[in-house]
Amino acid sequence: MSLINMNLMLAFTMSLTGLLMYRHHLMSALLCLEGMMLSLFTLTTLTILNTHFTLTNMIPIILLVFAACEAAIGLALLVMISSTYGTDYVQSLNLLQC
């Protein structure tokens, strides 16, 4: 395993632990999710380039599309929640209210 792959896996695990530790704030959770998607994108791109497996060239592009959709939905929810409740604490949301 090369040093670049180990660094990317370390970045993914750091983002995952950040997501688990800072799940109380929506903005921190979204940033950790973006870090995970960025490391996954780079890892899949490097793996495809190293193996010369041409049938899976579209996988990084599909991953970028999912990351962009996740970011757009996450930011829309963040704006809606922060304008409604005045904070981005996930614990302050009561999902049972109408």
Swiss-Prot record:
GO terms for biological process: ATP synthesis coupled electron transport. It catalyses: a ubiquinone + NADH + 5 H(+)(in) = a ubiquinol + NAD(+) + 4 H(+)(out). One of its GO terms (cellular component) is mitochondrial inner membrane. The chain crosses the membrane at residues 1-21, 29-49, 61-81. It is a multi-pass membrane protein. Coiled coil: none annotated. The keyword Electron transport applies. Pfam families: Oxidored_q2 (PF00420). It is found in: Mitochondrion inner membrane. InterPro entries: NADH_UbQ_OxRdtase_chain4L/K, NUOK/Mnh_C1-like. Its main location: mitochondrion. Keywords: Electron transport, Membrane, Mitochondrion, Mitochondrion inner membrane, NAD, Respiratory chain, Translocase, Transmembrane, Transmembrane helix, Transport, Ubiquinone. PANTHER family: NADH-UBIQUINONE OXIDOREDUCTASE CHAIN 4L, NADH-UBIQUINONE OXIDOREDUCTASE SUBUNIT ND4L. Core subunit of the mitochondrial membrane respiratory chain NADH dehydrogenase (Complex I) which catalyzes electron transfer from NADH through the respiratory chain, using ubiquinone as an electron acceptor. Part of the enzyme membrane arm which is embedded in the lipid bilayer and involved in proton translocation. Core subunit of respiratory chain NADH dehydrogenase (Complex I) which is composed of 45 different subunits. This is NADH-ubiquinone oxidoreductase chain 4L. The gene is MT-ND4L.
